[in-house]
C-alpha cells in the first residue's frame, strides 16, 4: 500500500535524478476550476517515466541487480530504464518495436542500453 513514508522515500531516492519541474496554469483547459500542467517534458529523458523506472530499479536487491534488467518500450520508458540502469551500474536490455521513433532509439542507445528491435 502506498504510504506517505514511501512517497518521502521515493522523493529522497529521486532527488539527484529527477528535476524539479514547474506547474503552469492552463487557462484554456480550465472550465469551472484552476487546472495546472506539470512540465515533466523538461526531465532529462523528456518525460516523467524516469521517475518510476529509477525508483523501481533502485529498490532491486544485489542479486536482482546482478542479473540486469529488461524492458519493452517504444521510447519514454525505454529511456527511463536505460538511464536508471546506467546510473546504478546495472546492465540493461531494451526491446523496442520496429518503427520506434529513431530519436527515441538513438537516445536510448546513448544511455548505454543494449537495444533489440
Named regions from a protein language model:
Residues 1-115:
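PLP-dependent amino-acid enzyme catalytic core
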